[in-house]
Regions:
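Catalytic domains of riboflavin
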Residues: 1-164
Length: 167
């Protein structure tokens, strides 16, 4: 069976328009696809669709600068994960900063994710533990680690053009 993939330029166009792409990795790695959208554009409807259709763990990849600014630290000191997925602890937006109540609804998760993308957000805007799972991309992105986390962050950085720092 022949597999066809879109170009990076096509993916960037979809992301810039607030859409969702499937980011696939190599058959020799995890051989899976992740649904990716830009955090600043995420809606409750998009979160709901991602949870319904992908039925897996929903994560929010961030660049190392954002992780540092928001105080997102590694979940474990030494990961035994063969792919070294860079999990941090989970968070919810605070009610004061985001209006989040329980954190579990699609509305609350979207608000938390948008706050993570907010360039004025601080650590005080989040409660932990929560229902949103940040992942911290390695410094240098795909040039440093070949993973969905780095690919998603690199696409977001390229896609933002000359806009402010975003996830």
């Amino acid at each position: 069976m022949k597999t066809t993939f879109d170009t990076v330029a096509d993916a960037l166009t979809v992301l810039r328009q607030g859409g969702v792409i499937i980011l696939a990795d190599d058959e020799s790695r995890e051989n899976e696809g992740d649904l990716v959208a830009l955090a600043q554009d995420i809606t409750p409807e998009t979160v709901h669709m991602m949870l319904r259709e992908a039925a897996g763990l929903m994560c929010t990849p961030v660049g190392p600068g954002i992780a540092e600014r928001l105080g997102f630290t590694e979940m474990v000191a030494e990961s035994t994960d063969p792919h070294q997925t860079p999990f941090t602890y989970t968070v919810d937006g605070t009610f004061e900063a985001t209006g989040v109540t329980t954190g579990v609804s699609a509305m609350d998760r979207a608000a938390t994710i948008r706050q993570i993308a907010n360039p004025t957000a601080t650590r005080a805007d989040f409660n932990a533990p929560g229902h949103t799972q940040p992942l911290t991309a390695k410094e240098g992105g795909l040039a440093t680690r070949i993973g969905h986390t780095e690919a998603a962050v690199d696409l977001a950085q390229i896609g933002r053009a000359s806009c402010r720092e975003r996830v």
